[in-house]
Amino acid sequence: MRVTVTASQTPILNAPLDRALHPVIDEVVHRSVSEATTKDGYMRCADYAIVGAQFLTLLTGVRYRPVAGGEVMDFGDGNLYVLCSTRERRRTATHLSQLARYHCWIEARHTHADGRVRTEIVDFTLRHDATVAAAVGMPFSGVQRTYLWGWTDEHEVPAELRDHPAFAKQGPHWRWPERECTELLRAYERERPNYFGRQVSRAMNLLADQIENHG
């Protein structure tokens, strides 16, 4: 089954979503992705971003976009790890799988009543941070979370970490989109419409079950 998702569809919920719904959406997106992949969704940030963006767009009628680029991961106690593909790799890669180090997440721009434009950021992969730390041989003492959901202007690098070598190249940013990476991510999305459509449908069914069971 293919699900075609556009931002003009009649919304089911208002965006930005109430914070009380965040863990519910996180759970159904994770279950959908993990059931369709291996290792509980580990190393599948692209799938989380694409399925999550399509699902949120379907729910709200607002355009949520999967984006890809670099990330500085915070493992706690000042242990930071940089995920970033080299410029040469970004220029020569013809498929997302050819990017050695990258991260994917979701963004949406919202215009508030006072005219302010803010960027909402959603990342359903924080549940795997401790596993990443173990894989690269670094200790993990950070906060155990399953997702990040908020605003870019509220998710800033603390002053005490801004001089860390991890931020030397891109400045004090936890995540930064890269055009080439995002283009490859969107190509991957177009390449497998039925695959992602099934996961979005699964997430919608899981959400309906949640509402029915707890309504």
Model-derived features with residue positions:
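A structural boundary/capping signal
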Residues: M1-G215
